[in-house]
């Protein structure tokens, strides 16, 4: 996944973009066979909720049983890094340009929204997955579910 040259993003902004992307992406079952985002977002949310307590429990358990501190800390750090890996991946995905097959479908969905009377901001540059998430979220609110039949 390459990042477009005109949208430079630093390492820490990818986490923020990943969080925004996970909140924007519509969690619809009909999108799951085509896009991996549903699974990644679900697992990232799960990791954000459960990995910190698991890391603390693992650290305390290994120390209480007389284990060494090094492996205990390494295990806890690994558990804490899992949610960050998910957010980083989502941030990278949000700025990735759409492939040609999805790009055509993106413009079809935008056309259906405009035909329904929705005012959409013009697309600047090559659309990315964040633009797709915004468009899909709006389409699920405004259109009937038949717009997914072309997917």
UniProtKB/Swiss-Prot annotation:
One of its GO terms (cellular component) is plasma membrane. It is found in: Cell inner membrane. It is a multi-pass membrane protein. The chain crosses the membrane at residues 46-65, 69-91. Keywords: Cell inner membrane, Cell membrane, Membrane, Transmembrane, Transmembrane helix. Pfam families: DUF412. It comes from the Bacteria. InterPro entries: UPF0208 (IPR007334). NCBIfam families: PRK01816.1 (NF002493). Belongs to the UPF0208 family. This is UPF0208 membrane protein YfbV. It comes from Escherichia fergusonii (strain ATCC 35469 / DSM 13698 / CCUG 18766 / IAM 14443 / JCM 21226 / LMG 7866 / NBRC 102419 / NCTC 12128 / CDC 0568-73).
């Amino acid at each position: 996944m390459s990042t477009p040259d005109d949208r430079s993003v630093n390492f820490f902004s990818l986490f923020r973009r990943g969080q925004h992307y996970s909140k924007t992406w519509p969690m619809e079952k009909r999108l799951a066979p085509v896009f991996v985002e549903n699974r990644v977002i679900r697992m990232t949310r799960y990791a954000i909720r459960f990995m910190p307590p698991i890391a603390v429990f693992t650290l305390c358990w290994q120390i209480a049983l007389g284990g060494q501190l090094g492996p205990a800390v390494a295990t806890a750090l690994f558990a804490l890094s899992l949610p960050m890996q998910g957010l980083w991946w989502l941030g990278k995905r949000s700025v990735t340009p759409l492939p040609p097959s999805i790009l055509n479908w993106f413009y079809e969905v935008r056309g259906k929204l405009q035909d329904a009377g929705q005012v959409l901001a013009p697309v600047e540059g090559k659309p990315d997955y964040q633009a797709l998430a915004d468009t899909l979220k709006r389409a699920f609110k405004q259109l009937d579910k038949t717009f997914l039949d072309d997917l």
